[in-house]
Amino acid sequence: MSDLQKLLTEFAAGRVALIERHEASARTVSNYDFNNTYQYVINREETHLSWLQTALSEYGVVLPPAGADALPPPPPPTRGQKVESGAFRGILDDDARYLGAFVEKWRAPVNAITHARHRNMLNVILGESIEHQRFFEQAAAGFEDLLGRRTGGVPRVGAVLPTRWLE
């Protein structure tokens, strides 16, 4: 296994761990605006994983599982009549911290890569991870207009269900 293949595989395992954590968090965080942010982040992370899969396919390798990089799931969702947005602060803080740790771990190794295409791809992923970290930090601080402002002063009502499809 080449050094680049090893780095790409380990980086991908870390990304798999993050998306698994964010999917679990999205099932827990019922605040509509915060959950929309998770959906946006997960969508971008799926794109990142497709890029990594393409890079790994050059070596005949598939995306690895999170394995040792797996992150703990968030606590179970709070149920009740009205859940305050502050109830999700711990989950949002944790997700921001996990993204920050991922970027910190990989910044120097990625910058040392001599393969320009893979280095640039990984730097884009790290840059977007910093953006996602900022989203979660803002949400943890209680800022709900992360992806845009509501029009006409319409109040926030309702919550997101933890399961997409009910049968």
Residue ranges and their predicted role:
Residues 1-167:
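Iron-associated oxidoreductase/ferritin-like identity signal
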